[in-house]
Amino acid sequence: MDPLRRDFLKTSAAVALTSQIFTGNVRGANDRLSAAFIGMGKMGRSNLGYAMRQENLLVSAVCDIFDRNLNTAVQMTQKQPGGPAKGIRDFREILADKSIDVVCIATPDHWHPYMTVEACKAGKDVYVEKPVCVVVDEGVKMVQAARKYKRVVQAGTMQRSAVHFAKAAEIVRSGELGKVTFVRCWNYGLSEPEGIGNPPDQEPPPGLDWDMWLGPAPQRPFNSNRFGVDPADRYFSRFRWFWDYAGGMMTDWGVHWLDIVQWAFDEGMPTGISAFGEKFYVKDNRETPDTLQVTYEYPGFLAVYENREGNAQSMFDKSGGILFNGSKGTMYLDRGGYKIVPEKGSALEASEMKSTSGGNREHWANFLDCVKTREKPTSDIEKCQHSTTTCLLGNVALRSKLRLDFDAQKWTVNQPEAKKYLSREYRNPWKLVV
């Protein structure tokens, strides 16, 4: 049998297993896992929906510091066997509840590290959304906590659970595209010139605990864009565009694409990073750039991530994706599938594969199965820590205006002026301690 075919069958079989609804008996014939969900915005409710389709899972609690989100999440659980989930405003109640087995953390990014570490210390297994952290040091501690407390921690980079992404990564690893020396990832769009607007600071809305929302982040007056929740629920929260809480498109979408790139190249990390970008187009109060280009030097190839909000024209008429450029051919890959275009004179045949699933449901099934088996999940925290760090380094290069040399053994850069961006000080009383 062709080696690529054999390896793909192994990979596909592993991914396909996760597409089955989780039916493992974790603690007894009729005993279900008890789950709690922290952060019930659009992403949290999406995870809640996929998790509730799994068997042997009872959603015991949902948690949010904004009444509207909390009430909506409780309502979603009304018809589940076992009755509706309890609505909780303080996540520490969930961590103290010994009856809860697993937690899903889908808060704004700046809360991910603290909640994940504390959940591991409390004996919970964790499904945490991507990007898993806001600075490099936090990701290192998250991995340390998972290993120290022997917890299963799955990150929300669900593309790894989609069959066509697994097949595409195997194609790159197999050499079918020849020597791949250049990879391009992008997200292009055309925003309105006013962007997200310039709302003034004001009092927080009723039903929101703004101080708790900020948590370990610096004290700031309430601003509707920093909070970012759309009253009409039309878009994901705009906190993503402020450095205190996130890393802009570089970490929000870049982590999806670069996670697949690093998967295809056996989880390797970049050694050199340079970046250029600015707010050239939109006139709003966001802090992250609307135009960005980051170049990563890996052993043997270069990868580029690009984002722009002032022009939507792109390769293959796609707003985002990955191009793997090899000596025998090029592969375009996104959530819709992949397409291979041979180089002139190459024996490589043109081919394509359509997506059959986005991977969300399979990702949850894989997580719950690993809770049972105690094996590492498809997107183990260490893999997403690597991918998130790669994205964060792009922002560090941008903000420091330096070309970075990265040491993956020590998780640091060789440029002293840039090291201040690798960690952050937590606001009292929060401390990130493994």
Residue positions per predicted region:
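N-terminal secretory signal peptides and thylakoid transit peptides that target proteins
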Residues: M1-A16
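Residues forming the Rossmann-fold NAD(P)(H) cofactor-binding site
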Residues: R45, P113, V255
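N-terminal Rossmann-like NAD(P) cofactor-binding module of classical short-chain dehydrogenase/reductase
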Residues: V103-C104
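N-terminal Rossmann-like dinucleotide-binding module
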Residues: S12-Q80, Q159-A162, V261
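Beta-strand-loop-alpha-helix segment that lines the small-molecule cofactor/substrate pocket
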Residues: P108-D109, P113-S161, G175
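Conserved SAM-binding strand-loop segment of SAM-dependent methyltransferases
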Residues: A85-D90
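Alpha-helix C-terminal capping/helix-to-coil transition sites in glycosyltransferase folds
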Residues: D97-S99
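Contiguous beta-strand/loop segments that form the cofactor/metal-binding neighborhood of enzyme cores
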Residues: A166-K167, K179-E382, T388-V434
